[in-house]
């Protein structure tokens, strides 16, 4: 029997930024490479890094607005060109950078006529606005407008489900994701057992972090996730067959989906920027969706139960699992 020698590169792994540009105040791009890697390692690192970039990095958002002038969130206020809903959507798009812990207060207090921009927000210390020119509202008459704001730092996304009509306070859907997109690709070189790989990683951010900062934070978060495995003691668990088996009842996808949308009053714009990577789905369900070109929450909710069941290796129980996860978010 003859064994082939497997040659492994002894070169030290190196990474570098090969492209970096700022398209606007709210769009940064960076392209990085890591090499040399053994066959299969680039995909392992690329998948883990992409999920960490999109789901593990914290961001800062405006999460609530309060004003005595606002009767309800779909009303119009005399002297203001935009509806309340449009103002809340504009506040949702304000990009902030901070090192906050917990919740902080901010304030807008202006007198018309004139334009209200992000520059008019009175911020707490350690919070800065990335683009002061972002539009909030237009006052067409000489009126006073004061809006109290809540600012939070978190990760992932938060879909607010209830309004506090008594104190004129209105929630704002928050997407705490400084990284807007991340992709990886692989270049293979060499022959046979000497085949190696180069990992290319592309990162787009909203300006609150540079791609390099995002890459550093994602790497640090992944390291922290794996550290406990270095100290774990080997344990053996014995479970009886079917000890934790659960019978899952059938639930019509359409009805629960309609109720979910009514309950959360979510907007398509928010769903469009929420990737299924952030839903913490089981790997098998996640892989089935990705193979069917379902990449965002909006893609997912645009499918009926019948559409999902037609996906190869997808089951009714998987539909219920997805709904259970969505309703807890």
Swiss-Prot record:
The keyword Cell division does not apply. Its EC number is 2.7.7.6. Keywords: Chloroplast, DNA-directed RNA polymerase, Nucleotidyltransferase, Plastid, Transcription, Transferase. One of its GO terms (biological process) is DNA-templated transcription. One of its GO terms (cellular component) is chloroplast. Its main location: plastid. It is an enzyme of class 2 (transferase). DNA-dependent RNA polymerase catalyzes the transcription of DNA into RNA using the four ribonucleoside triphosphates as substrates. This is DNA-directed RNA polymerase subunit alpha.
């Amino acid at each position: 029997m003859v064994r082939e020698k497997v040659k492994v590169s002894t070169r030290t792994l190196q990474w570098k930024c090969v492209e970096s540009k700022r398209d606007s105040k709210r769009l940064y791009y960076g392209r990085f490479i890591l090499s040399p890697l053994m066959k299969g390692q680039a995909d392992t690192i690329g998948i883990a890094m992409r999920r960490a970039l999109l789901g593990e990095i914290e961001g800062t958002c405006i999460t609530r607005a309060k004003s005595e002038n606002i009767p309800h969130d779909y009303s119009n206020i005399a002297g203001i060109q935009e509806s309340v809903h449009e103002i809340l959507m504009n506040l949702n798009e304000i990009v902030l950078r901070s090192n906050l812990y917990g919740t902080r207060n901010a304030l807008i207090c202006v007198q018309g006529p004139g334009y209200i921009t992000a520059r008019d927000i009175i911020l707490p210390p350690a919070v800065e606005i990335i683009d002061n020119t972002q539009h909030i509202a237009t006052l067409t008459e000489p009126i006073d407008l004061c809006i109290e704001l809540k600012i939070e730092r978190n990760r992932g996304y938060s879909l607010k489900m209830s309004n506090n009509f008594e104190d004129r306070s209105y929630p704002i859907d928050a997407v705490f994701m400084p990284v807007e997109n991340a992709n990886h690709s692989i270049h293979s070189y060499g022959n046979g057992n000497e085949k190696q790989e180069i990992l290319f990683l592309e990162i787009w951010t909203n300006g609150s972090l540079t791609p390099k900062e995002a890459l550093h934070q994602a790497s640090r978060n992944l390291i922290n996730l794996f550290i406990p495995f270095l100290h774990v003691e080997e344990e053996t668990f014995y479970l009886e067959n079917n000890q934790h088996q659960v019978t899952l009842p059938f639930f019509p996808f359409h009805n629960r989906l309609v109720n979910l949308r009514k309950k959360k009053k979510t907007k398509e714009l928010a769903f469009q920027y929420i990737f299924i990577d952030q839903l913490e789905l089981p790997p098998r369900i996640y892989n089935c969706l990705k193979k069917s070109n379902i990449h965002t929450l909006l893609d997912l909710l645009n499918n009926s139960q019948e559409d999902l069941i037609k996906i190869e290796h997808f089951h009714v129980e998987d539909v219920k699992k997805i709904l259970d996860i969505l309703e807890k978010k």
